[in-house]
């Protein structure tokens, strides 16, 4: 009898683990769709501009509009839906995403396309914020960062596979075909989430409690860790194409292949960053941020050599996304009584870091600071160095909280 009971318990545990894994893959598919729609416009700017009769710079504002939609939508959507069960919220977000991309595919003019991009962007921060909470609740406590990393793998795969395939599709059959493809992927993700993601009870916290948590200094520091720790990546990465072409001497046509190397790096970094964060959160975060700082600083030198540049771009990818699971897990730990809004705001902080980093790099180039473009990578390392200082502060606050 004891053997039968143990066998049944083992079967149930295996079934539970399988269900959790499938649920994580469902979240990954949703993340893939959202990541694809975020980045795809970069590869289709000429086609969009020509079809809608606007300039390339004006078409480029579709990227800015999406980023602003993410930053604004993250807190607004989460606050407005705080009483909604988390699975229902995910499905609601996917419906908005599907509608936004279908509208983009049908857009008769630039204005409608911009509105469609913003509508799709409103779902971004909340999906990754709520998805992080659900992913963390699907697994034992010691595996939470790894679960978050699995979900974010969808975002990294969108860079490696989704964007190149979507760009090819758009160039071959028109940019609207790409948005129709993303709409279909979103619909499939919706069905998969319905079938595989279990109903997860919403936190018992009220809106007042959710907002109250945001008054904590530890939450502010966690957000600043994300803004500056990740912002340095985009100080350099935003201008990676001119660095590769104008400084290293690669041909413009080779840039896309080099970016695939970066994409492989961020996938590896995301997975192993999650594993390391589950073992030792702050030591791993500080170690990866230190690696990121060193790699960025050296990039100003290695950019003069093609072989060294390839190695640098790959390691940069590993270090860049190696921080993501740990930064997200730290926010969940810091605001564990009301994680949904805090987690979502941390996604907005990643995007704020992207915008801040791009702005800093642009200022360096525009002003010709220390030679302009060649100085961008080492200036980026100073941004991540600030992130390290905030991470040390965050570690100190966590120790103080543990003692109290």
Where do the PLM segments sit?
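Helix-loop-helix hairpin linking two adjacent transmembrane segments in secondary transporters
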Residues: 108, 112, 140-195, 239, ...
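Paired small-residue
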Residues: 96-103, 111-120, 307-315
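A membrane-interface helix-boundary motif in multi-pass transporters
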Residues: 171-183, 363-384
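Cytoplasmic helix-loop-helix junction between adjacent transmembrane helices
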Residues: 116-154
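Conserved MFS/SLC helix-loop-helix module at the cytosolic interface between two early adjacent transmembrane helices
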Residues: 72-111
């Amino acid at each position: 009898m004891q053997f039968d009971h143990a066998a049944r318990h083992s079967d149930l545990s295996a079934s539970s683990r399988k269900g959790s894994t499938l649920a994580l893959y469902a979240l990954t598919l949703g993340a893939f769709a959202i990541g694809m729609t975020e980045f795809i416009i970069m590869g289709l700017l000429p086609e969009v501009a020509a079809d809608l009769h606007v300039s390339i710079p004006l078409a480029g504002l579709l990227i800015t509009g999406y980023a602003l939609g993410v930053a604004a939508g993250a807190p607004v959507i989460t606050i407005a839906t705080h009483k909604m069960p988390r699975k229902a919220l995910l499905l609601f977000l996917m419906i908005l995403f599907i509608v936004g991309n279908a509208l983009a595919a049908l857009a008769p003019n630039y204005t409608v396309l911009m509105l469609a991009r913003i509508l799709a962007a409103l779902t971004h921060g909340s999906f990754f914020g709520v998805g992080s909470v659900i992913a963390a609740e699907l697994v034992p406590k010691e595996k939470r960062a790894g679960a978050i990393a699995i979900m974010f793998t969808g975002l990294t795969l969108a860079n490696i596979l989704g964007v190149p395939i979507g760009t090819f599709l758009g160039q071959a059959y028109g940019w609207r075909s790409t948005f129709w493809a993303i709409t279909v992927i979103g619909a499939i993700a919706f069905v998969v989430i319905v079938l595989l993601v279990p109903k997860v009870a919403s936190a018992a916290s009220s809106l007042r409690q959710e907002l109250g948590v945001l008054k904590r200094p530890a939450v502010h520091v966690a957000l600043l860790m994300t803004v500056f720790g990740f912002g340095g990546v985009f100080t350099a990465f935003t201008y990676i194409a001119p660095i590769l072409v104008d400084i290293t001497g690669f041909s413009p046509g080779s840039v896309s292949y080099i970016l695939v190397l970066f994409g492989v790096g961020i996938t590896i970094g995301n997975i192993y960053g999650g594993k390391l964060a589950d073992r030792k959160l702050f030591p791993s975060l500080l170690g990866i941020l230190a690696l990121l700082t060193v790699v960025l600083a050296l990039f100003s030198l290695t950019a003069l050599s093609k072989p060294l540049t390839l190695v640098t771009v790959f390691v940069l990818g590993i270090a860049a996304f190696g921080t993501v699971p740990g930064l997200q897990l730290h926010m969940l730990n810091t605001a564990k009584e009301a994680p949904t809004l805090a987690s979502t705001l941390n996604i907005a902080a990643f995007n704020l870091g992207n915008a801040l980093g791009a702005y800093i790099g642009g200022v360096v180039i525009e002003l010709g600071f220390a030679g302009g473009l060649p100085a961008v990578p080492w200036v980026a390392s100073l941004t991540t160095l600030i992130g390290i200082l905030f991470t040390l502060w965050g570690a100190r606050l966590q120790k103080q909280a543990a003692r109290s």
